């Protein structure tokens, strides 16, 4: 599904489902030649014709996000788990194609040590890249998409490598310490050559309202200067250097509202009221097993404004006692669900849509709203199922997962700008 989305947006958007099914049946080399290899990376590495073509073509940059939490120089923690092989296959691809620049992106958990006898996978993978092929100088960075213009708090780790001969010929060096991003007006010291420079100040950082305020119907559309500037960036994918759509219906794609039961909508409205009242949503996790527990909670809520009314005007409760009864009826063991705030950036976009409730409408977020938080243009189309069951997610990548697994285009653009400057300097020195 994710490969189909890539093909539709980067190669040919007239490709039908039948065309895609036929494409999946093509050989490895045919897919590589077409620009999208859907086969496993191991198949590409084992296909000599494909690899010879890539080597002869010459590759400047290799970018990827192999699952690295289980990476170890001493061996694989679980040899039966194919995901533990992917970092090594990625490094093999780098070794054989000799790109000038390598970029690896992953979650912050990659920095955790799993054994007192080993460094973290993040540290070990940096060393492995240094030793790959002709060698690379390596810069580790901790970045947050928020510092690059995304309306979302999204911390990530990245490893950026520049081939040693290219680095030495042009005087580029990496710092020994991990570099951490910050807002443009809060950067402490110089930004390393192998680090993406932040692009927004704290005041310029967009909020949930800036990102999706025009996609809701409860309040007037939020159209301040910051919102206007943000949405202008996302109007078309052509503004990002991507191919223009062959057709445009005028409708924003992937903006299908999810349907919920009456009980679920009640819970969502309660989450919204709790947020606006500055009350933790964890009150829904409290076990109200006796009258004393009810009285204690009612006393805690007594200072809140009543009647309790949700953002869409629905009355939730007339007083604290009625609200406690509602909380008892809507009790849940789910700890991660909460309503987003209009005046803050979004939480980290994840692959499952159920954790975050819309700020003013009793529903979860749409695929498009999540894509806005990431920074995808409005005419960037996600194809396939919207969501799927947990077991099928092992081999299917539905739309919500495609969005949640992606690198924010805002951060990706900053990395691309850094690479363009590096390679531009290399080309200038070579001429």
Task: List the predicted regions and their residue ranges.
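Glycine-rich phosphate-binding loop and adjoining beta1-alpha1-beta2 segment
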Residues: 1-54
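Conserved beta-strand scaffold positions in the cores of enzyme catalytic domains, especially
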Residues: 35-38, 138-140, 348
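Class I S-adenosyl-L-methionine
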Residues: 47-56, 74-321
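Residue-level detector of short, conserved catalytic/binding motifs and their immediate flanks
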Residues: 60, 157, 347
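N-terminal Rossmann-like NAD(P) cofactor-binding module of classical short-chain dehydrogenase/reductase
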Residues: 60-63, 103
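Glycine-rich, N-terminal phosphate-binding loop of Rossmann-like dinucleotide-binding domains
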Residues: 66
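Active-site beta-alpha loop architecture of Rossmann-like, nucleotide-cofactor-dependent enzymes
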Residues: 69
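C-terminal target-recognition/interaction regions appended to catalytic cores
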Residues: 230-431
């Amino acid at each position: 599904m994710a490969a189909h989305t890539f093909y539709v947006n980067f190669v040919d958007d007239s490709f039908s489902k039948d065309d895609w099914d036929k494409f999946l049946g093509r050989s490895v080399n045919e897919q590589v030649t077409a620009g999208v290899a859907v086969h496993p990376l191991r198949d590409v590495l084992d296909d000599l014709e494909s690899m010879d073509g890539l080597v002869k073509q010459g590759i400047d940059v290799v970018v990827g996000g192999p699952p690295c939490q289980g990476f170890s120089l001493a061996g694989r923690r679980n040899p039966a788990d194919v995901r533990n092989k992917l970092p090594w296959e990625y490094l093999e691809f780098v070794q054989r194609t000799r790109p000038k620049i390598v970029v690896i992106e992953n979650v912050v958990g990659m920095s955790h040590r799993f054994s007192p006898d080993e460094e973290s996978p993040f540290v070990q993978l940096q060393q492995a890249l240094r030793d790959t092929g002709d060698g690379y100088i390596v810069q580790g960075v901790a970045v947050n998409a928020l510092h690059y213009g995304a309306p979302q708090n999204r911390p990530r780790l990245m490893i950026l490598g520049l081939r040693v001969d290219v680095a030495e010929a042009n005087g580029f060096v990496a710092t020994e310490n991990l570099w951490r991003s910050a807002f443009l007006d809060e950067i402490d010291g110089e930004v390393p050559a192998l680090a993406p420079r932040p692009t927004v100040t704290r005041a310029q950082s967009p909020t949930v309202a800036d990102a999706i305020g025009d996609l809701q119907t409860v309040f007037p559309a939020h159209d301040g200067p910051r919102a206007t500037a943000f949405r202008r960036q996302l109007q078309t994918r052509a503004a990002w250097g991507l191919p223009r759509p062959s057709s445009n219906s005028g409708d924003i794609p992937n903006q299908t509202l999810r349907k919920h039961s009456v009980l679920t909508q009640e819970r969502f409205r309660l989450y919204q009221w709790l947020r606006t009242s500055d009350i933790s949503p964890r009150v829904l996790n409290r076990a109200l097993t006796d009258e004393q527990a009810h009285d204690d909670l009612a006393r805690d809520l007594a200072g809140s404004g009543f009647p309790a009314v949700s953002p869409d005007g629905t009355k939730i409760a007339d007083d604290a006692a009625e609200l406690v009864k509602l909380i008892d009826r809507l009790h849940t063991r789910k700890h991660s669900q909460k309503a987003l705030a209009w005046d803050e950036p979004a939480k980290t976009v994840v692959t499952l849509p159920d954790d975050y409730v819309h700020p003013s409408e009793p529903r979860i977020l749409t695929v498009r709203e999540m894509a806005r938080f990431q920074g995808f243009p409005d005419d960037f189309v996600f194809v396939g199922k919207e969501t799927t069951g947990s077991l099928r997610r092992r081999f299917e990548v539905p739309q919500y997962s495609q969005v949640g697994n992606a690198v924010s285009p805002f951060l990706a653009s900053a990395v691309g700008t850094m690479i363009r400057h590096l390679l531009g300097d290399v080309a200038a020195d070579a001429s």
